[in-house]
Amino acid sequence: MSNFTAEDKAAITSLWAKVNVEDAGGETLGRLLVVYPWTQRFFDSFGSLSSPSAIMGNPKVKAHGAKVLTSLGEAIKNLDDLKGTFGQLSELHCDKLHVDPENFRLLGNVLVTVLAVLHGKEFTPEVQASWQKMVAGVASALGSRYH
């Protein structure tokens, strides 16, 4: 079941077609780690996360951010089945990594901020509303194993 209207889907897919996964992914994960420093504990293997510049310049942060957004691209192709799309990732993050599901919501909100910065006037309030709905749905799907 989907809560996404045809307009939501169009707004999401239209903007997504213009997103550079490497740039936006690195920026999103980097900002998450800077703004919410407690999230750094999940990335001990990434090397130096000692300052904002170290985080934003860290190649492992950029690579993992791109991986996260690549996964999000799969969700965008399957907006009507976010829970199914993220079933295995939910299990991994819950059972093995023990990630607080609140972090998924935070990451989604940071992504919306990054998209607004990168896409300026094109990121209208209507586009933002559709993206907020999508990142909330993704956060819920990723947290579904916890429920």
From Swiss-Prot:
One of its GO terms (cellular component) is haptoglobin-hemoglobin complex. InterPro entries: Globin, Globin-like_sf, Globin/Proto, Hemoglobin_b, Hemoglobin_oxygen_transport. The keyword Nucleotide-binding does not apply. GO terms for biological process: hydrogen peroxide catabolic process. Keywords: Heme, Iron, Metal-binding, Oxygen transport, Transport. The lineage of its organism: Eukaryota, Metazoa, Chordata, Craniata, Vertebrata. Heterotetramer of two alpha chains and two gamma chains in fetal hemoglobin (Hb F). It comes from Aotus azarae. GO terms for molecular function: haptoglobin binding; heme binding; hemoglobin alpha binding; metal ion binding; organic acid binding; oxygen binding; oxygen carrier activity; peroxidase activity. Gamma chains make up the fetal hemoglobin F, in combination with alpha chains. Residues 3-147 form the Globin domain. This is Hemoglobin subunit gamma. Belongs to the globin family.
